[in-house]
C-alpha cells in the first residue's frame, strides 16, 4: 500500500530517488538559459553558479530528510499500520499500534512522520495536525519521549494495563462467587476452617446490631414496668374487697380490726402479684434463650 509523507513538504522526498549531483557544475561551465538570449558566457556562468549552489543546498537538505524520514525496511517489523503515532507533547503512544518498536528505535535516531493512507481512510485530522506541529520540541524532550516510549513498549509486550485490570476484576468476582457457593453448601465446614485459619474470630458490631440491642432493652424495661403496675393494681383491689368482706362477716365495730384485715389483704395481693410477675419474667427469659 502506498503511503504519503506530507510532513514539512517532503512528499517528493518520500518517493523520489536520492539526488546524484546538482547543476552547479553546469552553471560554472557557463550554460546559457533555455532561450539563450541577453546573457554573455560570463553572466551565464555567474548566474548558473549561484543557482546551482542554491539548488545543491536544497537537495542536500532533501537528501538528509530522506535519510531521516524514509520508509522502514521490510525486516524492521513495522506492519501496514505505519509508524508509531505521537500525540500532543510526543510522549503518549498507543500500545495497540506498537509492532516493531524495538528494531525501529535501534535503527533510527528520531521518530518518522506518521504516514497517511492514499485514500484517507480512518484519518484523525486533529491527531495528525498535532503531530505535524512537533517541530518546535527540543532535543532533550525528544530524548525523554523516546526513552518513555521504550519503557511503554516493554510494558505493552505482556499486555496493557486495561487487560491486567480486567483479569484482576475477574479473579475477584470468581473468588467471591466460590466463597458464596461454599457457604451455602457447607456453612459449618466453612466456619470450622475459618476458625482454624484465624487466630481470633470476632463478629463486628454494626450500627444495626447496637440499635437492636437498645430496642430490646427498652422493651424489656417497659414490660417490667407494666407487670409491676399490674401487680400493684391487683393487690389494691384484692385488699379493698377482702376488707369489706371480712368486716361485714365479723361484724366488729372496732377500727383496729378493719385496719388489720386491710393490711392482711394488701399483703396477700402483693404476694399474688409478685408470683404473677415472676411467671411473666420467666416466660420472657425462656423465649430469649430460645
Curated annotation (Swiss-Prot):
Transmembrane segments: 226-246, 255-275
Keywords: Membrane, Phosphoprotein, Transmembrane, Transmembrane helix
Location(s) in or outside the cell: Membrane
GO cellular component, one term: membrane
Annotated signal sequence range: none
Organism this protein belongs to: Gallid herpesvirus 2 (strain MD11/75C/R2)
The name this protein goes by in its record: 38 kDa phosphoprotein
InterPro entries, per database record: Herpes_pp38
UniProt KW Transmembrane helix keyword: yes
Post-translational modification: Phosphorylated.
Other comment: Expressed in both lytically infected cells and latently infected lymphoblastoid tumor cells.
Membrane association type: Multi-pass membrane protein
Region of interest: Disordered: 1-49, 67-87, 111-146
Presence of keyword Zinc: no
Disulfide bonds: none
Skewed-composition ranges (Basic and acidic residues): 34-49, 113-145
Native organism taxonomy: Viruses, Duplodnaviria, Heunggongvirae, Peploviricota, Herviviricetes
